[in-house]
Curated annotation (Swiss-Prot):
Keywords: Cell outer membrane, Ion transport, Membrane, Porin, Signal, Transmembrane, Transmembrane beta strand, Transport. Functions as a substrate-specific channel for nucleosides and deoxynucleosides. Also functions in albicidin uptake and as receptor for colicin K. Gene3D superfamilies: Nucleoside-specific channel-forming protein, Tsx-like. This is Nucleoside-specific channel-forming protein Tsx. It comes from the Bacteria. It is a multi-pass membrane protein. Pfam families: Channel_Tsx (PF03502). It comes from Salmonella typhimurium (strain LT2 / SGSC1412 / ATCC 700720). Belongs to the nucleoside-specific channel-forming outer membrane porin (Tsx) (TC 1.B.10) family. Residues 1-22 form the signal peptide. The gene is tsx. It is found in: Cell outer membrane. The keyword Transmembrane applies. GO terms for molecular function: nucleoside transmembrane transporter activity; porin activity.
Length: 287
């Protein structure tokens, strides 16, 4: 983890001299005026998507957009890009997954139908999706999951953004688990954005999102659970081109593994550590 922190800290130091110039540019130039994208260096610590704690440093492509009836957020990661991580970490150079992807496209029902479906605090309604794909290095290390359902934006009356989505889940590949190729459970997602203040020539904001998963048949298997929670809390400092983030993420039954379960994957007994906190440091360039 020292290497993780040092690597991201070094990247922060190297880019700090450029942020002032970016902040002075009143009209920054991007490749698109609606497709907002960046390349990030991410250092992760004690993530709990499996029963073993994982640390990594990797490259990420991230994008978000909102245009007419289309609303989008997504990212593509290259695990262990720099060949730095702990003993549990596997990635593109070490017989692990060369690519991990998550996308969240939403399609406005209001705009596609031409009908105003708003009422009360519910501003707009969407056909909402959340698709996750882990390429893995073989079938046993691959995941493909599609959540689909209904989403909405909420008018809170405050200077903040709030959206809610509820999905049913179709599980294709899932690292060889017993719930593959079937409808299996549900997800409720809440996302919010709160601008805080101007700071050091940039914009400081708080972003949060939480996934509540429940109703999975995987809980019928030994050492697995039918539910899980992943809750992320992000403090972000944004400039025209550079951005920096500190992320705290809480996992409950991460990866639907029962916390404290006694496991053996062929290299000795260990206890699952699927509940607790992890974190990320991020530095990125918007283009």
């Amino acid at each position: 983890m020292k290497k993780t922190l040092l690597a991201v800290s070094a990247a922060l130091a190297l880019t700090s001299s450029f942020t002032a110039n970016a902040a002075e540019n009143d009209q920054p130039q991007y490749l698109s005026d609606w497709w907002h994208q960046s390349v990030n260096v991410v250092g992760s610590y004690h993530t709990r998507f499996s029963p073993k704690l994982n640390n990594d440093v990797y490259l990420e492509y991230e994008a978000f957009a909102k245009k007419d009836w289309f609303d989008f957020y997504g990212y593509i990661d290259i695990p262990k890009t720099f060949d730095w991580g702990n003993g549990n970490d596997k990635g593109i150079w070490s017989d692990g997954s060369p690519l991990f992807m998550e996308i969240e496209p939403r399609f406005s029902i209001d705009k596609l139908t031409g009908a105003d479906l708003s009422f009360g605090p519910f501003k707009e309604w969407y056909f909402a999706n959340n698709y996750i794909y882990d390429m893995g290095d073989n079938k046993a290390s691959r995941q493909s999951t599609w959540y689909m359902g209904l989403g909405t934006d909420i008018d809170t009356g405050l200077p903040m953004g709030l959206s809610l989505n509820v999905y049913a889940k179709y599980q294709w590949q899932n690292y060889g688990a017993s719930n593959e190729n079937e409808w299996d459970g549900y997800r409720f997602k809440v996302k919010y954005f709160v601008p805080i203040t101007d700071l050091w020539g940039g914009k400081l904001s708080y972003i949060g999102f939480t996934n509540f998963d429940w109703g999975s048949d995987l809980g019928d298997d030994p050492n697995r659970t039918s539910n899980s929670i992943a809750s992320s809390h992000i403090l972000a400092l944004n400039y025209d081109h550079w951005h920096y983030s500190v992320v705290a993420r809480y996992f409950h039954n991460g990866g639907q593994w029962q916390n404290g379960a006694k496991l053996n994957w062929g290299d000795g007994d260990f206890s699952a550590k699927s509940t607790g906190w992890g974190g990320y440091l991020v530095v990125g360039y918007n283009f």
